Amino acid sequence: AALKAGGAAVTVDRAGGRTRGALVVAEMTFAVLLLTGAGLLLKSFVELQRVDPGFNPRGVLTFDMALPRARYAKPEQSRAFFTELDRRIEALPGVETAAGVFGLPLSDFNYSISIEKLDGGPAYDHPGNARSTQLRVITPDYFRTMDVRLLDGRALDETDRAGAALAVVVNESASKLLWPGDDPLGHSLELGTSFGLGGARAGGTVVGVVSDIKHFGLGEASRPEVFVAHSQFPVDFLSMTVKTSVPPQSLVAAIRGQLREMDSELPLDQVRTMDEWVAASVAQPRFYMLLLGIFAVAALFLAAIGIYGVLAYAVRQRSNEIGIRRALGAEAGDVVRMVVGRAMMLAGGGLLAGLLASFALTRILSGLLYGVSATDALTFAGVAILLAAVALLASLVPARRAARVDPMVALREE
């Protein structure tokens, strides 16, 4: 009753107060929208970092090697070159294993090949539509170099020579596509026309199964892949992978020296570590997360300043009213609750509007998210708690200032 009696004696600038309050609510709404988007992208980025790429990138150096067809026109020349290159690199101090692959993981290298026959019969999903997989040509030790898990059978090795029956290793996705519910070992398949064999089809037998590898991005689904030996399926381009026990970049000069001895005209292209390939694959999500995060923090700061400014102005304008309330029996705690309550009302309005807007607009982000829903409840709850905490902190100084108003000074001014 004392608070109401004191408040009735004071006239306030209601129109100006409503305008200032509306601006703060708008700032809070914008902050909620940006914070929710940034929170979703952050959670998605964390989920991406947890994805198993199907290989171990640590300590692996990579570079591209393309042989000019004018000087390496025959398949046996390509076989001999990459066999010797593997041998020379593996002999270097600090190198554990080395191998080449036609299609490095996370490099967006895409080479699809049709599967024309399975176990002697047609390999069609329906008439006229052949199944297809990604083709990977590798040299021995590739799976060991990249630490790819062998799930069944054997890996491709030196016994898979030119002229011998074509040996094929498939990944889990290819196994499920081509022989669902069955063990693929020992099954035969015929690969479609390929430049690797001069346009001829290649029939082979499955000798091993490996785990899926994320070739097209950590957030992308793994695709069916078949692996064949370079000695049996010669190509003139491979990405070399080198597993090292020393810092990978420290071996670049030695590798370049070995290559110069083999062919001084061949360059060492795209020299990177697999850790760099992994980092590059999440560079875009990281950029979006940081950009939205910066704007969100700025919006949150402006909203906090807005709440502080509105409350500080209101306390100055209503100091006489507050003093009268105190003189009529209001406690300091009552005054603090009044000021903080005003802050919570402003924050609540902005929070409600912001969450409703976020619920509608964050669906636009769904294409950028991995492993998290665009309406993730934990993210929305976290943003609500953060905004409430910021509003509370922003109101503390004006609230304490209001609680220290001297009622005797206010009564003399009245």
Set out the residue ranges of the language-model regions.
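Intracellular coupling helices
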Residues: 1-10, 305-346, 401-412
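Alpha-helical transmembrane segments of integral membrane proteins
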Residues: 1-72, 408-414
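Short juxtamembrane loops and helix-capping segments at transmembrane helix boundaries
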Residues: 2-12, 47-60, 330-332, 357-385, ...
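Membrane-helix entry/capping segments
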Residues: 8-24, 232-237, 256-257, 261-299, ...
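Hydrophobic alpha-helical transmembrane segments of multi-pass inner-membrane transport and secretion
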Residues: 16-42, 285-320, 348-349, 353, ...
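Nucleotide-cofactor and metal-assisted catalytic machinery
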Residues: 40-290, 413
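Conserved G/P- and acidic residue-centered "switch" motifs that form tight phosphate/ATP-binding loops
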Residues: 153, 171, 329, 354, ...
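Transmembrane alpha-helical interface segments in multi-pass membrane proteins
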Residues: 299, 320-366, 382, 386, ...
